[in-house]
Amino acid sequence: MSGIYWGRANAWAAYTMACVGKFLPENYLYPQYMDISGALDEQLTALKGIQTKHGLWRTILDDSESYEEVSASCGISAAMVVKGNIFHKKYIQRALDGIIPQIASSGKVMNVSAGTAVMRDRDGYRKITRDWIQGWGQGLALAFFSELL
């Protein structure tokens, strides 16, 4: 892989790991789940530290020159909601405050990057278009909003 911390990949990983606990009865009895839960805790702790002042996460998480990417922000926030850690509450609220303005009156989730292959360098990720509606952006936004209910 490229070694670049791509926002949406981290979002999918975090949300998937968070959801495992919801669907695995008595998950605390499974040592493998403890590995997943521990990895998720470490990931979310790191992600909290790089949330932007607008409450979003960037397409390249650790790159201040890359744009804020809404599908990544929705997925990461959904993972925080599912995890249910009280210390995530302020980060979830910041994300919600940043995501809501990115939803057009038509329902389109804006600032979602197009399909993304593994890029050779950071500039490849920075240049991905955000002009069109993307199913994964709509889906991750719906996941986030439904988890808030």
Regions found by a protein language model. Name each.
Residues 5-8, 31-35, 39, 68-71, ...:
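Alpha-helix N-cap and loop-to-helix initiation/capping positions
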Residues 36-55, 91-108:
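Long, well-ordered core segments of solenoidal/helical folds
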